[in-house]
Amino acid sequence: MKIPVDKSRIPSGVSLFDKITSVEIEKEDLFKLGISKHEVPAEHVLETDYLYLLSKVSAYIQLYSDFITVNGNQIVNCSTDDRVMKDVSEIVGIALGLKLTIDCFGIRQENISKIPPPASKQKYLDYKFAHKRKNIELETKGTTSKYISKFI
């Protein structure tokens, strides 16, 4: 599916998004990217967090695939349970945010890592990666309020 980028939401003077007019993503990619929201156990046996999470994607698809419908360039949350609606919203929001980041910066998913929560209860961003000798942190959004509703 091809989702157009809403340029009206980008602050003026930010040229990073100039070359991106749309994001192309398949339904399965929503799960491959959306699974990044999960914590990786400290004692996992695979060599990278990315490989650990990738090994869980098929289970993730089995759990949530029936609640996501793709119609053209629309993604529909088909759940009626508010908890599942929130999970689906987070999966889609995180996946689209990471996909846009991957396309804009020309990086691979395995180069993005989740930022662990700080010891103190302060705010922090979700993910980080290195690009051109700079450390970049980003925030993705899956839910927009405490009251989740269906999205199209």
State each model region's role.
Residues 1:
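Acidic/aromatic/glycine-rich contiguous surface patches that form carbohydrate-binding/processing clefts
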Residues 102-127:
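A short acidic/basic microdomain associated with nuclease active sites
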Residues 109, 151-152:
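Acidic, metal/cofactor-coordinating or nucleic-acid-engaging core segments within structured domains
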Residues 126-146:
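Conserved catalytic cores of phosphodiester-cleaving nucleases, focusing on short active-site segments
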Residues 9-11:
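N-terminal, intrinsically disordered, low-complexity segments
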Residues 17-99:
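Interdomain/boundary linker segments immediately adjacent to catalytic/signaling cores
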